[in-house]
Amino acid sequence: MNKAELIDVLTQKLGSDRRQATAAVENVVDTIVRAVHKGDSVTITGFGVFEQRRRAARVARNPRTGETVKVKPTSVPAFRPGAQFKAVVAGAQRLPLEGPAVKRGVATSAAKKAAIKKAPVKKALAKKAATKAPAKKAVKAPAKKITTAVKVPAKKATKVVKKVAAKAPVRKATTRALAKKAAVKKAPAKKVTAAKRGRK
């Protein structure tokens, strides 16, 4: 579709003559060009955004000669299609037979639906993280209990050994004392028997 065809379609939709449709198209184009030239952007909800993009200096090649050519920084006009425009072209949104193809509020509702779809994903990730956390705690707790259980018997064992070692000398001392007493008691008996034999 060229400019003349666009004017013809606009004339039929507006129900006006060709002059008014031509003036409308030319005024819209003129307004967009002047705004973008100033550095402003023209946003048409659902349709897209006309804006100016700055390109930095770069090195390019001449396709014919193959020589490198330095390109100065320039500004170029650009157009970013809107969400509804993209949805209609992609087939995600039905194009109405009558009325405007792009309406207000449709983009906002689509954005809300996208936000609702993204939210459950975050919740699911949070639940997965919550399930992973208890597993780590369960692993750490038994490890600490095992170490304490091992340490306690070790202390008791050392105490038992010390007690046994302390008691052992007492038994030896008592046995020695009893042996000495028995020797003392036996010695006088031998002397008495020897004296009796001398008297006889």
Swiss-Prot record:
May also be methylated and possibly phosphorylated in vivo. Signal peptide: none annotated. InterPro entries: Hist_DNA-bd (IPR000119), Histone-like_DNA-bd_CS (IPR020816), IHF-like_DNA-bd_dom_sf (IPR010992). It catalyses: 4 Fe(2+) + O2 + 4 H(+) = 4 Fe(3+) + 2 H2O. It is an enzyme of class 1 (oxidoreductase). Keywords: Acetylation, Cell wall, Cytoplasm, DNA condensation, DNA-binding, Iron, Oxidoreductase, Repeat, Secreted, Transcription, Transcription regulation. Disulfide bonds: none annotated. GO terms for biological process: chromosome condensation. Residues 179-200 are annotated as: Disordered. The modification N6-acetyllysine is found at K3, K72, K86, K103, K137, K144, K156. Its EC number is 1.16.3.1. Transmembrane segments: none annotated. One of its GO terms (molecular function) is structural constituent of chromatin. One of its GO terms (cellular component) is cell surface. Belongs to the bacterial histone-like protein family. Long actinobacterial subfamily. This is DNA-binding protein HupB.
